[in-house]
Amino acid sequence: MSDANKRINIQIGIEVEVVQKQDQSSGELTEGVVKKILTKSPNHPYGIKVILETGEVGRVKNILDNFLS
């Protein structure tokens, strides 16, 4: 399971890439900063769902901030 699938690795204020619902078929990623974490479970196979500061909603595919190291 990737880091983006574990809620513990997602924090408000970090920079991430998400895939929005309408972009699931194309896989187009949207970059932004996490405003709120929507997924309540500790992990999710398709990525943790978040709201970005822009108001866009998507599932995290990549964590761009390197706070894990």
Label each region the model flagged:
Residues 2-68:
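Basic/aromatic-rich interaction segments and small domains that mediate binding to polyanionic partners
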